């Protein structure tokens, strides 16, 4: 896995986890303030190894750590718009 691939996957997981937490506020309540959150993918041991190494390097003394084990990441959808219709008009 290249550095770029690791960065891209980390960014995607962080974004998706943030969206998940916004939709499921009970998750946010389980994360201690100031915790280091480490996102791991069940089907990607190479990514997980790098994520853990990075977390170990970044963790501050006494900082709580929360491991989030993600079963899988669904493929992205291109858009959430449903059947948009365009209309060319000469004026409003």
Protein language model features and the residues they cover:
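Terminal, compositionally biased segments used for targeting/anchoring and flexible tails
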Residues: 1-92
């Amino acid at each position: 896995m290249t550095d770029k691939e690791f960065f891209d996957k980390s960014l995607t997981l962080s974004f998706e986890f943030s969206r998940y937490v916004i939709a499921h506020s009970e998750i946010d309540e389980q994360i201690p303030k100031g915790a280091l959150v480490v996102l791991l993918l069940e089907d990607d041991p190479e990514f997980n190894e790098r994520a853990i190494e990075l977390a170990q390097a970044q963790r501050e003394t006494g900082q709580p750590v929360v491991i989030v084990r993600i079963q899988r990441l669904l493929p992205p959808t291109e858009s959430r718009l449903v059947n948009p219709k365009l209309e060319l008009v000469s004026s409003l």
